């Protein structure tokens, strides 16, 4: 029994070691479709990182809220660049995407991350009134330009499911999860 347990532990270590080799990750991702990895200026983390995580997210999506929580590990490790591209599948909800963009543009990345976390935790139930406390200037042309950039990215990729996560423009290979990305840089 002890021998089997030791052997299993050794195999797990070897697998983890191999899995965290960026060359292995890149090789597995090589045959996947590639998408534009610069679809947003809503970015968090290390701007010089060689790892770009693109998050295609719907502010009202519960799995997107769960993904945002999982991304906290990457955000706080500061080992990659995380960019958000917002979508909604109901045009009436586009205003929330614009509010989230406005928070980023008017308060900066650090505060925006906190606000996004609060939104996904329970702010979404308050809808537009959630943003009242921020006194956002919603008449900025920059908000509309960024919103249209997100819309264009959505049209060009033809993604229709959220959350969709890309790493350096490709989908995460089988056997990996988003938390593994912090070890690839």
Predicted regions and their residues:
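C-terminal cap of thioredoxin/glutaredoxin-like
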Residues: 1-4, 50-52, 72-75, 132-185
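Extended aliphatic helical segments
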Residues: 11, 24, 42, 53-55, ...
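Short amphipathic alpha-helical surface micro-motifs
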Residues: 36, 64-67, 148
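Residue-identity detector for glycine
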Residues: 39, 45, 108, 123, ...
């Amino acid at each position: 029994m002890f021998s089997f347990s030791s052997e299993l532990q050794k195999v797990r270590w070897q697998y983890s070691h191999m899995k965290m080799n960026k060359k292995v990750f890149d090789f597995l991702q090589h045959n996947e479709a590639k998408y534009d990895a610069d679809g947003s200026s809503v970015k968090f983390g290390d701007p010089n990182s060689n790892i770009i995580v693109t998050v295609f997210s719907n502010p009202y999506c519960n799995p997107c809220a769960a993904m945002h929580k999982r991304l906290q590990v990457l955000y706080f490790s500061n080992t990659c660049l995380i960019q958000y591209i917002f979508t909604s599948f109901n045009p009436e909800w586009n205003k929330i995407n614009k509010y989230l963009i406005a928070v980023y543009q008017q308060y900066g990345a650090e505060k925006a991350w906190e606000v996004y976390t609060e939104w996904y935790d329970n702010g979404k139930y308050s809808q537009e009134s959630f943003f009242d406390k921020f006194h956002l200037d919603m008449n900025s042309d920059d908000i509309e330009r960024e919103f249209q950039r997100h819309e264009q990215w959505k049209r060009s990729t033809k993604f229709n499911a959220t959350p969709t996560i890309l790493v350096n423009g490709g989908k995460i290979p089988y056997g990996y999860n988003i938390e593994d990305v912090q070890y690839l840089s």
